[in-house]
């Protein structure tokens, strides 16, 4: 696979290219902090683009992100690096929805948009307890959380209760990587079963 070559300053060019999009074109945005992000986005991106026929933007900090060479006409991809161009991207974002698997929104240099009312969605990149691997308050500033299971929902609601936080919308989404493996395993078992039946018949 041949990746586009980015040189110094290209992240700012990519940011300007993104900022020229209409509000309709930039309505749904995914942000990938690293290569692992796509493991958690894949199912949702497929649902949005292939089943719901929606257009999305995919913004990444990874130079060799495979999505930068995607042939899917419903996906516009942008590389913004992980420096000041990324900081500006978040501060000036104009989108209806931003989906990411990076925690600590508003805790450090990654902030909510100062110019537009964006709805922020967090997707877990682990099945473990919220308290076992995330900093305190790591997901407090998101509007919607895609939870792996009931344990995440219970932990988040308890945290909101204890710290008197604004309730977030919680959706039981599952775990992308595991769900993909389960689907692949089910397909393999069906193929294996058919192969065995053919052997018996012959």
Feature locations, PLM:
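Nucleotide-sugar donor-binding and catalytic loop/hinge architecture
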Residues: 17-26, 183-202
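Membrane-proximal basic amphipathic "stem/tether" segments
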Residues: 1-25, 34
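Polar low-complexity intrinsically disordered regions
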Residues: 1-5, 48, 197
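Active-site and donor-binding regions of nucleotide-sugar-utilizing enzymes
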Residues: 29-183
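Serine/threonine-rich low-complexity intrinsically disordered regions
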Residues: 7-9, 20, 65, 69, ...
